Amino acid sequence: MAHKATPEQRNEKLRSFVVATREMIEQDDFDKIHIRKIAEKAGFHNSTLYSYFKDAEYLISLASVKFFDQYSRSLADLSDKNLSEQDNFYEIWRFFCLNAFMFPEIYYNFFFGKHSDDLTAIFEEYYSIFPNEEYKHSSKIHSMYVGKNINIRCLDILKPLIGLDGNRLNEENVTIANSLIIAYFKALLEQVLVYRKDNKEVDTDDLTTQFMTTLEFIIKTD
């Protein structure tokens, strides 16, 4: 009679699969990562992997959280500062862009891929497997960070700007502004992907400045 795996044994298997996937993300294109290859690298049969994860795409998204480390650390530092809602908003987006343009394929798949509406569950599962990698954020930043999808994440930090001096946001146009911001971010991310494919150099600082300028144009009145 087979013994049921202990929570520690189960977590160890989960870690093996996630680490194997993370290493493959660093080495291969996303379209070359398959369940069988992940299972082989982790030292298990592919049927074992299916008993723990929905599919390869979910596992790739889960393993991608590791590449949010610098962004998450920046948010932890930001949490210790007493910034206004508006300054907080711009700083969060600046940190986000700097990291996204550094890892465009990972961020594009994570926020616009198959499981881009499962982000809360993905973050929670990842940090339950790797608790030492989780940084402490303020309650407001944490709520944004683990938001269900990019639309909710952005809206969560955009809404507090409604009615503030110097911006054009109100209850009627905030959803439109949110959609414009996300669409522009996605377009820039796609641009970076094309540059990478053509082996062109990408200036992440310049692209981030470009995004931030457009962000202010969408929100501010002057």
PLM region descriptions:
Residues 77-112:
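Hydrophobic alpha-helical connector segments
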Residues 34, 108-111, 170, 197:
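Short, hydrophobic secondary-structure boundary micro-motifs
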Residues 116-164:
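Amphipathic alpha-helical packing segments from all-alpha helical-bundle domains
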